[in-house]
Amino acid sequence: MSDPRPARAVVVGIDGSRAATHAALWAVDEAVNRDIPLRLVYVIDPSQLSAAGEGGGQSAARAALHDASRKVEATGQPVKIETEVLCGRPLTKLMQESRSAAMLCVGSVGLDHVRGRRGSVAATLAGSALCPVAVIHPSPAEPATTSQVSAVVAEVDNGVVLRHAFEEARLRGVPLRAVAVHAAETPDDVEQGSRLAHVHLSRRLAHWTRLYPEVRVDRAIAGGSACRHLAANAKPGQLFVADSHSAHELCGAYQPGCAVLTVRSANL
């Protein structure tokens, strides 16, 4: 008989890195809002064990989980913390966690940094996991004691993305910047495209502003690629909400101090 799936939780990949600690702090509000546990998971990769062997790997895992738990507890938030050490490839194990997780949170670096593939696990999870994935990229100046969101940013074409964006803005009490994109090659195209984009933006937002009247919405029109616009206008504290198909492009382009939340169309 197979093992039962773990209870639903907000899962954070912990590896001892500063980015992972920020991911745990960022995830606290998500767990508290859902009234579910915050599950901190450390994955020991057998192929990366040193001469100290499994014992050394277990010690490092316990130390990293203890440090992350202590920092979460220091927030004073009423969150239930669970910890677990798993053995295997980080990407494989975290993908398995995504089957039952309400959300998966990881740092933008770490997990696979020893192989020189900066952020590869995070970007792959963001594009392929079975639940929403938050990738946290802390600013070097931001202390590992808190992780704040100052604004949510989303492109309006995807209704699932908009729903998650409004929910995040409501949860964190911050404004939502809604972006509509148009493609234009001539001045006439720009004028016409901008006018149509404004109409499209108003139509797309009408339903959600009725459902979330407490969320302040700032509107923006952009030409060309939504990902390029979001990256070019990134500011510390912003949370970009996007479809998982944009994960690799966004995870490689956003600025320190920002975060990306990717959702699949099935993540309703």
UniProtKB/Swiss-Prot annotation:
Protein's UniProt name: Universal stress protein Rv3134c
Assigned protein family: Belongs to the universal stress protein A family.
An individual GO BP term: response to stress
CC annotations in GO: peptidoglycan-based cell wall; plasma membrane
UniProtKB keywords: ATP-binding, Nucleotide-binding
PANTHER family named in the record: STRESS RESPONSE PROTEIN NHAX, UNIVERSAL STRESS PROTEIN UP12
InterPro entries: Rossmann-like_a/b/a_fold, Universal_stress_UspA, UspA
Record carries keyword Transmembrane: no
Molecular function terms, GO-annotated: ATP binding
Residues the entry annotates as binding ATP: G13, G107, S108, V109, G110, L111, D112, H113, R117, S120, V121
Keyword Nucleotide-binding recorded: yes
Induction: A member of the dormancy regulon. Induced in response to reduced oxygen tension (hypoxia), low levels of nitric oxide (NO) and carbon monoxide (CO). It is hoped that this regulon will give insight into the latent, or dormant phase of infection. Member of the Rv3134c-devR-devS operon.
Effects seen without this gene: A strain lacking this gene does not induce most genes of the dormancy regulon, due to polar effects on the downstream devR (dosR) gene. Restoration of induction only occurs when both this gene and devR (dosR) are transformed into the deleted strain.
